[in-house]
Amino acid sequence: MSQFLYLVPTLTILVGALVLMFMSMYDKFNIKNHIFASSVFLIIALLFALSNVSNSFSVQPYESFLNNVLTFDSFSNFFNILLIAGTLLTLLIGEHYFQHRSYFKGEFFSILLFALFGMMVLAQANELITAFIALEIASFSIYIMVGYNSDDSKRVEAIFKYLVLGSFIGAFYLLGMVLVYGATTSTNLADVSTFIATANQQDMILVYIGLTLILFTFLFKIAAFPFQSWLLDVYRGAPMIITAYMASTFKIAIFSFFLRVILDYISPIIDFWDTILSVVIILTLVFGTWLAVTQQIVKRMLAASSIVHTGYLLLAFIALGYKDGHLINIDSAYAVMFYLIAYLLSALGAFGLASHIISETNVKVTFDDFKGLAKQRPFLAAMMTIFLLSLAGIPSTIGFIGKIYVFTEAIASGYTLLTVIAILATIVSVYYYFRLIAVMYFYPAPDNCETEEFDDKRVSTYAIMFVAILTVLGGIGSAIVFFIPAMNIDTLINFSQVAVQSLFIR
């Protein structure tokens, strides 16, 4: 019974998806009803997940319940909380956007919860087949949401490109899984880990090749070089709020499984991947920076910059290191976890606020559309500035703390050159992020615009404001709100440490 309780957050989301699917069959339920129902299920699931936080350093493998294909521990619960919170914030931030797009129907919100269900299962997956099924549930839900408005040719092109490339790269995962099974006679990660620890180098060839093919699948999903070609077109073609969801929450789900596999099961392969990941990191940082600098559409600029943030996260991964049978720098795993929190808030806030601004229009969201925003809507301009400062890694924001954490651990592991390149990419990022800030504050507003006072009572505005507050408190929380533990930077870091350390308790 206790094992079942740990599944309640995931099952709540699944039940919610099914209920919303049936609700969509009846015309009497409007968009507001679907948003409300979705929010209720998400809040219930979040409360159940938060209730499990007290079970720190716990590992509950479902050996008798689900044949050990899922694992519950503080690590998976950490990601459950992030994924549910990210989905809930996406829903609330996009509330105004959803209501002003007639093509959004009730079944869309069911698909959104199915995507979350797949992500949560992925975060708890303890077996390669289970992980693949969870990944595909989430991915196909995302495909549908990307191309939800079939009347828009850009979205049709985006979903076709994403679907074809995603299906193609999924074959790499399957091939890699077959090779791993051929070598180890198992797809359970615990069995694969045992084989890696005891086998000689000659027997490891198939395992290395198979796991590398699986690595390519995840590099595609997080849009690392050279698998980033789909990102700009797909992000541009997708509805703005779905772009926000893909750039933040979905990316976190991918990293959740990737990090679990590296830390808990196949850490020796980090040494084998060292050269591959080093090259990928350099090219991801350089190419992502070049793309971001050359964009004229804000949506594409933010999309390109997300490639750069992928490079930062991969830098923290490679900094884990492996020598003499153990990880060299476990603190780097804490850096990954903290940076994921920082990136979730910053990226979701920036993309979500852009969707909020254009919710009543159909513009492409170029830099010109933000001219004089500080005069037109000063409150929204201030919040966008906070998110951009955090993405750029400017002090007093959570993004700054995250970057410092990642760069410090990378240097400690001996990756000084990669860190220097990452710092240079950060310096260049100041240009394209501050370019948007300059447009908002130093360019004249259109002649026909009127200044709006802060009397916006929409749910979206308050949700964005909440994320902006967290972004600032995550950067200076220890200094100004030390008496509120939940707002303390050290609390977030400790939460990350507990999540990682639970993987090593058996």
From Swiss-Prot:
Question: Has the keyword Ubl conjugation been applied to this entry?
Answer: no
Cellular location of this protein? Answer: Cell inner membrane
GO CC annotations on file: plasma membrane
Q: Does the keyword Cytoplasm apply?
A: no
Family matches, as InterPro entries: NADH-Q_OxRdtase_suN/2, ND/Mrp_TM
Domain of life here?
A: Bacteria
Instruction: Please cite one Gene Ontology biological process associated with this protein.
Output: ATP synthesis coupled electron transport
The Enzyme Commission number assigned here is 7.1.1.-
Query: Reaction catalysed by this chain?
Result: a quinone + NADH + 5 H(+)(in) = a quinol + NAD(+) + 4 H(+)(out)
Query: Topology in the membrane?
Result: Multi-pass membrane protein
List keywords of the entry alphabetically. Cell inner membrane, Cell membrane, Membrane, NAD, Quinone, Translocase, Transmembrane, Transmembrane helix, Transport, Ubiquinone
A single Gene Ontology MF term assigned here is: quinone binding
Q: Where are the transmembrane segments?
A: 4-24, 34-54, 78-98, 103-123, 128-148, 163-183, 205-225, 239-259, 272-292, 301-321, 333-353, 381-401, 410-430, 464-484
Q: One Pfam match, by short name?
A: Proton_antipo_M
Give the chief site where it resides. Answer: membrane
- Please report which protein family the annotation says this sequence is part of: Belongs to the complex I subunit 2 family.
PANTHER family from the entry?
NADH DEHYDROGENASE
Q: How does it assemble?
A: NDH-1 is composed of 14 different subunits. Subunits NuoA, H, J, K, L, M, N constitute the membrane sector of the complex.
- Role summary: NDH-1 shuttles electrons from NADH, via FMN and iron-sulfur (Fe-S) centers, to quinones in the respiratory chain. The immediate electron acceptor for the enzyme in this species is believed to be ubiquinone. Couples the redox reaction to proton translocation (for every two electrons transferred, four hydrogen ions are translocated across the cytoplasmic membrane), and thus conserves the redox energy in a proton gradient.
Q: What is this protein called?
A: NADH-quinone oxidoreductase subunit N
Q: What is the lineage of its organism?
A: Bacteria, Pseudomonadati, Campylobacterota, Epsilonproteobacteria, Campylobacterales
